[in-house]
Amino acid sequence: LSFVDPDDYVHPEYAGCMKEALEKSGAELVYCYAMDIWASKGKSHTVSTETGEITVIPMNQYDWFEEKTHAVSWGVLYRQEIAKNILFQGNLKIGEDTLYLAECIHASRKIARVDRALYYYYINDDSVTNGRYSEKKLDELEAWRCVCKVFEDVPQVQRSAQAGYAIRCRLIAIKYCKDDEFMAKECSKVGTEFRKGAKELMKRWLQVGRYGTFLKTLYSYYFWNSWIRLKQRRKTYEVEI
C-alpha cells in the first residue's frame, strides 16, 4: 500500500525500488526521499545522495528530529498487515498524514529507508498546508501532540517527537506572525506549546553542533513575545527554525 498526493507524482522506478527494499530489509514499511519542487520559483531540492543504500531502523530508534527522517504518509510503501488496521483521522485537515505514519511506525518492528529521491513533491503557495492563515492551520500542531502520545511507551522516540513538535510550533509562529487573527487568538498559546518540547529541542541542537540555532531557540524560549516582534519586523525572509 502506498499513497500519492494528487498534486505530486513518483519516479517510474518508485514501485519496483520500494518493493525490493521492503523485501530485502524485512521491514514493515519503507520510505524514500522526496524531491521538493517549487514550481513558482523553478527550484528543487532533496537530501538524497542517490546511492540507493537501504538503511534499517528499529522502531524504538526512530528519530523524528533527524534530518533524513520521514514525517508524512506519502513516499512510503506499507505492508498490508500494518496499514490495514490504521485509519486517517478525519477531524484533522493538516497533519493527518504525519499521525498516520506515526501509528504505522509504532505498529512496526523495523522501518527501512532507501537513499533515492523517488517521490516528487510539488510545493504550492496556495495549498491547504501553505496559503493564508486559518484556524485549521493549527491542526498540524494537534497532529504532532497526538504523535507524542502515540510513543508514550517508547520514551526515546517520544522525546524526538517532542523536539519535532517544538520545531513545528516555531515554524507556525514565524509563518503567521503578521496575521492579526493569529496574533490575537493563538500566538501566546503556540508559545506555551513550544515550551513543552523546547528543552528537548535545544538539547538536540547542541548534540548536532547547531549552536547558532540553539541560541535562537533559547531566546524564543525565554523571550517569546520579543522574538515574535523581531520576526514581524522582517519585510521578507525565508522560514527558518
What are these regions (language model features)?
Residues 6-112, 119-136:
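Donor-binding/catalytic cores of nucleotide-activated saccharide
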Residues 27, 178-241:
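Membrane-interface aromatic/basic loop that binds lipid-linked glycans or pyrophosphate carriers
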